[in-house]
Structures are given as structure tokens and as C-alpha cells.
């Protein structure tokens, strides 16, 4: 809730795009490549072509757009910080929706992260269709 409170002005004053990658895509191409694919999709979903894209970390997606990688960028650049918050709020809301379909996993509370409770639910119920089969906590469950 506190993350999403301050987003009103960001949504009004900034351009943003979302890049969604499914759990099946992550399983096929690995988490790093999936992150780069999500970034690429988000950039391509922008309503404008950016003059420069700031990227948190050392890796950048393969696009013909000027980019600058910044290690720890979410704590240095306001634009990266805002993008990180927007992405987290979007994902949290998505997990709340998934909780309605898969209540046994309590996604509303754990947001899909590997909590003890979440792993216990996987042990008891098995995985559901949104779990990443390549995640070490899910392997052999």
C-alpha cells in the first residue's frame, strides 16, 4: 500500500511500459534472459521512443536505443527507482489476483516469494500452473 500511494504523480508525469514474461518463458530461457526480455518488452511498450534508457545493473536488453547501465541504479536514479516501484506494485497486484485462483498458496501474503509457508503449500499441494519449474525451491516437488 505504501509503495502505491506515491505513484499518482509518477503515473501522470512519466512514460512507462510493462514487460511481462511468463513462468514458462523463464523456465525456457533462464531468469537473467527473462529479465532482459521483460525490459525489452517494457521499452517497446513505451508510448514514445526514448532518447536514453537507464538500466539498473550491468546487463541491458538488445535494442537499438541508447542505454546506460547503472549498478545500484534504483538507489541512485529517481527514474529507475520509480520504475522499480511501478513494477513491484504491478507484480504485487498480479499476485493478489492469482491468489483468487490459487488460494492454497497465499500469494496475497507472500507475493510468490519463497517463504516457509509458500514452500509448505507446495509440499502439500504440489505446484500450480504459475510456478516456475526451474526455481530451486520447486524442483523435485
Question: PLM features: residue spans?
Answer:
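Single conserved hydrophobic/aromatic residue that forms the stacking wall/gate
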Residues: 1-11
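Structural motif
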Residues: 15-17, 51-53, 66-68, 84, ...
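C-terminal domain-closing interface element
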Residues: 16-41, 123-141
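Structural signal for conserved beta-strand scaffold positions within catalytic alpha/beta enzyme cores
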Residues: 18-20, 69-71, 109
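Catalytic beta-strand/loop module used to bind and position nucleotide/cofactor moieties
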Residues: 30-37, 52-78
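Stable alpha-helical structural segments in soluble proteins, enriched in small hydrophobic residues
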Residues: 34, 38-46, 82-90
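Oxyanion/phosphate-interacting regions
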Residues: 73-141
Amino acid at each position: 500500500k505504501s509503495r502505491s500511494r506515491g505513484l499518482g504523480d509518477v503515473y501522470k508525469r512519466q512514460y512507462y511500459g510493462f514487460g511481462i514474461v511468463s513462468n514458462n518463458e523463464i523456465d525456457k530461457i533462464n531468469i537473467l534472459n527473462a529479465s532482459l526480455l521483460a525490459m525489452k518488452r517494457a521499452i517497446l511498450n513505451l508510448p514514445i521512443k526514448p532518447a536514453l534508457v537507464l538500466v539498473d545493473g550491468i546487463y541491458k536488453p538488445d535494442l537499438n536505443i541508447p542505454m546506460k547501465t547503472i549498478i545500484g541504479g534504483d538507489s541512485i536514479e529517481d527514474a529507475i527507482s520509480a520504475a522499480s516501484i511501478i513494477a513491484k506494485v504491478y507484480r504485487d497486484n498480479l499476485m493478489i489476483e492469482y491468489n483468487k485462483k490459487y488460494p492454497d498458496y497465499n500469494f496475497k501474503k507472500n507475493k510468490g516469494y519463497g517463504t516457509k509457508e509458500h514452500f509448505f503449500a507446495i509440499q502439500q499441494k504440489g505446484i500450480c500452473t504459475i510456478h516456475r519449474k526451474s526455481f530451486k525451491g520447486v524442483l523435485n516437488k
